[in-house]
Amino acid sequence: MVSYYFVVHDMMAYFQHGDMICCKIRPETEPKHLKPKQQMFRKIRKGDKIVYYAAGSFVILGVFTVKSDMEYYSDEMWPSVFVRQIEPDLLPPKGKYLHIKKLLFESNYAFDVFPDKKLWHTALRGKTLKSITKADYDKFRRNLSESRFLVSENEIKIPVTSWQRSQGHNDAPVISSTGRISSW
């Protein structure tokens, strides 16, 4: 049975590893028994569906299918994390993103994951991912090309998140004309 998740990362993480999602490791675990900081990350399975949200930029980057089991991963961008490989199912039109605030406040949609639209951000605070209903997933998917909810890449901010600061990145990146991060 397919499960559905709302993954909270940031634009920088997506540009670094757009084919993966990650979760920090619990600091108190023994090396032989490493565990993800958010236990729900363990529950994700191959074939599950995710909505990829870029925190701080307020945009949905697309919907994806999980392609791998959880595995340990480490490189200079993502040192010592658990990852899962992902593959895009549907992305917004090139150079555009689905703006979550526009979708929430300029539509009549009700979302199970955000029972109180005014407090939508509190449902995500401190989360890497959150379980969502298929109905919510379908609403996000359906609106990835709905022009009234889209913003261009030039309209979004890419803040340096606490995760990125912890990795030694203190300057906000810029998206180049080729869609890559510049200034890093």
In which residue ranges do the predicted regions lie?
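Compositionally biased, charged N-terminal/linker segments
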Residues: 1-46, 132-168, 179
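GIY-YIG nuclease signature motif recognition
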Residues: 7, 63-64
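Short, charged beta-turn/beta-strand-edge "cap" motif at the junction between a beta-strand
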Residues: 54-59
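Aromatic- and Lys/Arg-enriched surface recognition patch
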Residues: 65-130, 134
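Active-site metal-binding core of divalent-cation-utilizing nuclease and nuclease-like domains
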Residues: 170-184
